[in-house]
From Swiss-Prot:
Detected in liver (at protein level). Liver. This is Cytochrome P450 7A1. Pathway: Lipid metabolism; bile acid biosynthesis; Steroid metabolism; cholesterol degradation. A cytochrome P450 monooxygenase involved in the metabolism of endogenous cholesterol and its oxygenated derivatives (oxysterols). Mechanistically, uses molecular oxygen inserting one oxygen atom into a substrate, and reducing the second into a water molecule, with two electrons provided by NADPH via cytochrome P450 reductase (CPR; NADPH-ferrihemoprotein reductase). Functions as a critical regulatory enzyme of bile acid biosynthesis and cholesterol homeostasis. The gene is Cyp7a1.
């Protein structure tokens, strides 16, 4: 027994030595400082995952503004100087921004690659998104969202006894329920043959979405979904409802989904379930960050009396100018694109809420060896290495945003009450100062719609409801760090609030 243990011990020791000699990457001349970590393959992943912000700050103090970390077998160059962000974007010809995102999508949602280079489809999906989420298409999408929000918030035929009563609910649960149902109907339409059971079906989809989304960080990290039986079953149920045979019988399906259905049928070799899973990816992208962003915007607005007053006055003025009535009854409220865009206070509230809660990781993959020229110097980058920006470092930098952990509803307003677009770091004007939606070629194509639907939600909450926290001195809930890198962080726990319809 002792001999066997000794042999195993020697084998492990030899393996570790071989890994140390062969497996550890060595820093070459001109490359950024390197952190390999102590654990094979994982490298620094556990430290990074436990608290990305503090991990990056610690390495920034140790190495300066540019350094390399091994994460899950990949070498990631972190650029932490906000003055260099725009310089990274200028090197676009050396980056493959699609590779990481397409691989992640296939891994999480269970379809084959949507990269045209892999031969499964010839669709340029980024062009599809741009065509159907911006410009004229945004008008019809926003109009549908406003109608669906009002249908969900103010269901027709509500008994007067219920409309007069205060309702107590978790604010995050409320935002989740309202935004999911309205967003689902806006993108995928409604089944007119199942009007009576429509709400129950969507709420069932909501439960499945929560189950799937709960394990999403693990899927992105590389764990197979088969390890999570409940989430796997939930994903398959969601996809089943998004098969083309089911979407074809729905009314008011968005232009985005109708175009994607056509392109999937004509340009891809995907089977029916894979096509449905590409639609599931759109559902996730439309909900996973918008829901927590909506919560933080509402929470921070109600928590700040100054923000509440300024927003209420702005919304009231906009509705009156548009000839709309500020009440819960009567005709539906509607503001067009020009009117929605002319709400600087709501814009600033949303931006400030997202600044405090966003923790996205902007990633690009090097297509070849090249030299990256930044404000801090030039660095040699190897092919297949990743370049990463972590904008939370900038969003919480006191040099750029004084008192960065405090919500200031007018932080993005200038002295004249218009949108503020000038921010500085070390006396230098920043070209990039607000990045919750990504940057450059990887910027979220649906960002304009996301902001508009949050704005519409806030308009309806202010115009239709009386709003109060259950606790008068409510504290800000901590952020759920388990989703760091994916976008907007949800609250670690919910906050109780109460609401009732205005009369």
């Amino acid at each position: 027994m002792m001999t066997i243990s000794l042999i195993w011990g020697i084998a492990v020791l030899v393996s570790c030595c071989i890994w140390f000699i062969v497996g550890i990457r060595r820093r070459k001349a001109g490359e950024p400082p390197l952190e390999n970590g102590l654990i094979p393959y994982l490298g620094c992943a556990l430290k990074f995952g436990s608290n990305p912000l503090e991990f990056l700050r610690a390495n920034q103090r140790k190495h300066g503004h540019v350094f390399t970390c091994k994460l899950m077998g990949k070498y990631v160059h972190f650029i932490t100087n906000s003055l260099s962000y725009h310089k990274v974007l200028c090197h676009g010809k050396y980056f493959d921004w699609k590779k990481f995102h397409y691989t992640t999508s296939a891994k999480a949602f269970g379809h084959r690659s949507i990269d045209p280079n892999d031969g499964n489809t010839t669709e340029n999906i980024n062009n599809t998104f741009t065509k159907t989420l911006q410009g004229d298409a945004l008008c019809s999408l926003s109009e549908a969202m406003m109608q669906n929000l009002q249908s969900v918030m103010r269901p027709p035929g509500l008994p007067k006894s219920k409309s007069n009563a205060w309702v107590t609910e978790g604010m995050y649960a409320f935002c989740y329920r309202v935004m999911f149902e309205a967003g689902y109907l806006t993108l995928f339409g409604r089944d007119i043959s199942k009007t009576d059971t429509q709400k129950a079906l969507i709420l069932n989809n909501l439960d499945n979405f929560k189950q799937f989304d709960q394990v999403f960080p693990a899927l992105v990290a590389g764990l197979p979904i088969h390890l999570f039986k409940t989430a796997h079953k939930a994903r398959e149920k969601l996809a089943e409802g998004l098969k083309h045979k089911n979407l074809c019988v729905r009314d008011q399906v968005s232009e985005l989904i109708r175009l994607r259905m056509f392109l999937n049928d004509t340009l891809s070799t995907f089977d029916d379930m894979e096509k449905a899973k590409t639609h599931l990816a759109i559902l996730w992208a439309s909900q996973a960050n918008t829901i927590p962003a909506t919560f933080w915007s509402l929470f921070q607005m109600i928590r700040s009396p100054e923000a509440m007053k300024a927003a209420s006055e702005e919304v009231s003025g906009a509705l009156q100018s548009a000839g709309q009535e500020l009440s819960s009854g009567g005709s539906a409220i509607y503001l067009d694109q020009v009117q929605l865009n002319d709400l600087p206070v709501l814009d600033s509230i949303i931006k400030e809420a997202l600044r405090l809660s966003s923790a996205s990781l902007n990633i690009r993959t090097a297509k070849e060896d090249f030299t990256l020229h930044l404000e801090d110097g030039s660095y040699n980058i190897r092919k297949d290495d990743m370049i990463a920006l972590y904008p939370q470092l900038m969003h919480l930098d006191p040099e750029i945003y004084p008192d960065p952990l405090t919500f200031k509803y007018d932080r993005y307003l200038d002295e004249s009450g218009k949108a503020k677009t000038t921010f500085y770091s070390n006396g230098n004007k920043l070209k990039c100062f607000y990045m919750p939606f990504g940057s450059g070629a990887t910027i979220c194509p649906g960002r304009l719609f996301a902001v508009q639907e949050i704005k519409q939600f806030l308009i309806l909450m202010l115009s239709c409801f009386e709003l109060e926290f259950v606790e008068s001195q409510v504290k800000c809930p901590p952020l759920d760090q388990s989703r760091a890198g994916l976008g907007i962080l949800p609250p670690l726990h919910d906050i109780e609030f109460k609401y009732k319809l205005k009369h």
